[in-house]
Design a protein with these regions (language model features):
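Short structured motifs
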Residues: 81, 159-161, 203-207
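Terminal beta-strand-rich extracellular "head" domains
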Residues: 194-213
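Parallel beta-helix/beta-solenoid repeats that form elongated, surface-exposed shafts/blades used
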Residues: 1, 6, 22-23, 28, ...
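Short, low-complexity N-terminal tether/leader segments at secretion or assembly junctions of large
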Residues: 2-24, 38, 219-227, 231-241
């Protein structure tokens, strides 16, 4: 006698052996209707998730021990927008989108409404005659030490990524640099992109010829990529005292 576990169903008259076989075996069932979880959860193993009809990965889930926070997705009626929310047991729950690699991007298509932005910045207490400004790392760089000479600013992606690789043609990036002068008037006299000197277009029509003594000078740079390794750079120097 066959003692294996099977699924039987009634066709209205007879009890029919579905011949599925042992439940312990792996099967890929095909549904001809909606699947209702009857107000229960679907349990997904760590690093497993949802694949498409070609067996390609679409969504993966990872497990956090004793997790109390999660993501909630809500649909919307006509005229409203669906919502992805951070929810859970904590009072304040953020939402982090992490890209892969230095050149990974978070792309928002359509109009974007932002209530507030916190920008990453770097504070350095070491003066550099050639300051490599890593635009993939920060939007504000504060050189919190007095200048010892005039200096060069080199705009790049980071130590291993050229700005030419990080920016597409037609894109731009803006950076701010804060430098301190004690009783000296040193200033940024050379601007480079990926190590190549560029002639910037300066606010007011002329490049500065010095810094401001006993002040903090703030430089802003907007690099617009117009072609491969070709940039228009807008620059300004503003005294704060």
């Amino acid at each position: 006698t066959d003692k294996s576990t099977k699924i039987l169903y009634l066709n209205g008259t007879d009890v029919v052996d579905s011949n599925i076989g042992k439940l312990s075996n792996d099967y890929t069932p095909t549904l001809a209707a909606n699947l209702s979880t009857n107000s229960k959860n679907i349990i997904v193993g760590n690093t497993y998730g949802i694949i498409d009809e070609n067996a390609n990965e679409q969504i993966k889930f990872s497990t956090t021990a004793s997790a109390t926070n999660e993501i909630t997705i809500a649909n919307a009626a006509a005229g409203a927008s669906p919502v992805i929310s951070a929810t859970g047991g904590d009072t304040n729950v953020g939402l982090t989108l992490t890209t892969k690699g230095d050149l990974g991007r978070v792309t928002l298509n359509g109009e974007t409404k932002i209530f507030g932005v916190f920008e990453n910045n770097t504070i350095s207490t070491t003066f550099q005659t050639t300051l490599n400004y890593d635009l993939l790392t920060q939007a504000v760089y504060f050189q919190n030490v007095s200048c010892l000479s005039n200096f060069t600013v080199n705009l790049r992606g980071n130590s291993s990524t050229a700005l030419n690789s990080a920016l597409n043609t037609g894109e731009s990036v803006t950076a701010a640099l804060l430098v301190k002068n004690d009783n000296t008037t040193f200033y940024n006299n050379v601007i480079q992109v990926d190590g190549t000197t560029v002639t910037a277009i300066w606010q007011g029509g002329a490049a500065p010829t010095g810094g401001n003594a006993s002040s903090t000078d703030v430089y802003t740079y907007t690099a617009i990529k117009t072609a491969a390794s070709t940039y228009t750079v807008l620059a300004s120097q503003t005294q704060f005292k």
